[in-house]
Amino acid sequence: MNDFFKYVECAVTVCDTECVIVYQNEKSVAVNGDMRGKCMLGCHNDRSRGIIARILSEGVSNSYTISKKGQRKLIHQTPWYKDAADGSGRTVAGIVELSVVIPGEMPHYDRG
């Protein structure tokens, strides 16, 4: 299988439902260190753990911006899914987090 995210210019981190990191692209490893096979909960406070639990239990997404080391970033966390074992549809399999550096000012377009 192709690793489409290996060299993209944003950090891509994926965990399973036990919050164990199952994938990091090159950018994620460079920013966060190699966390593959480790539980990510130790890196998060109680508030963040609550958000993680909600994403996993309700299948909702979470987005916000941060400033870190002089860069603004958009963080988007969204569930990923797998087919349900009983064939009834799909079930949350974990979380994908995208961390994208964004400029201080950027255009916004209304396409509606």
Each language-model region and where it sits:
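Sensory modules in modular signal-transduction proteins
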Residues: 1-24
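Sensory/regulatory domains in signal-transduction proteins
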Residues: 23, 27-111
